[in-house]
């Protein structure tokens, strides 16, 4: 599916991390977003997606099957589902502790000198620097 160029981009962005929210999100798509002519849904997963290859690097409970259900609901209504997964250099919440990847591999941290409970302005987000390799 492709967003039609003759229609403006009307998108909804949300962050999901819990399997129990999937049915409510599908209800939102079908009962509210579709009738309001939304044509894109950006689903930010961050550590909420349970990776099949490395499930230990996830905090959430969203599964592949959950994403398939969301995508099917979107497509039934002409909405383009757009997944958003953070890259390796963004592996923490704003002013929060590092996500599981950095907990298991602190050698990747560019900001390893900071304590887990550091807050703004001492810490914005944990980051990884390719030069740490």
Task: Give the positions of each predicted feature.
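Active-site-adjacent "subsite" loops/lids of carbohydrate-active enzymes
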Residues: 88-133
